[in-house]
Amino acid sequence: FRSVDPTRLVHYEGVTRIPNHQYDFITDMESRMYAKPQEVEEYLKQNSGRPYISCEYMHAMGNSLGGLSLYTDLEDKYEAYQGGFIWDYIDQAIETKNDDGKTVLAYGGDFEDRPSDYGFCTNGVVYADRTYSPKVQEMKALYSNIRMSIQNGMLTVENRNLFADTNNLSFVVRLEKNGVVLKSDTFSLNVPAGESKTMKLTLHKIDSAG
């Protein structure tokens, strides 16, 4: 690979499974599939000088991705941690009609096919019809470069972008009780890249339970 284009990084996950790391020189990064967060951190603590990428992680099948924050938290602690690639992006299913004539998304086993991998083609964070699964909410929040936190009536906006400020964004803060919006504020706040700003919230307190 390097002889064809020496400017590009080489990724080869297979060498990480060879004992004694004797072929580590082949790849420019450490890369593993489905390593536990503590295993990833163990490598990062060694500070070998090579970045770490999870080339496949967080098998997004069914009600999953609950532990994603254990990985994204490492981004704040270790510069060498470069994230990973969720398996996978979208479900593989076929739109068809069931016996009642209703349109459904069918997959392994729905066509009396044997052998079959059954639901193992439905591992996506997006459904086959391109609608978002609930897992997208978790992923979007943790992957966001803009973080907001509230403490003692003060709102802190952190901009983790490398270059872009927040000048083109609108921020919305809502006060809800039992799902009912009591008050909502929309405001602008220009936070330069890599910086944070804190402002006082104008939302009133709720004295009753709920």
Question: For the regions a protein language model found, what residue spans apply to each?
Answer:
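Extended substrate-binding grooves/exosites of carbohydrate-active enzymes
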Residues: 1-154, 161-167, 172-181
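Intrinsically disordered, low-complexity Pro/Gly/Ser/Thr-rich segments with frequent PxxP/GP/PP motifs
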Residues: 169-209
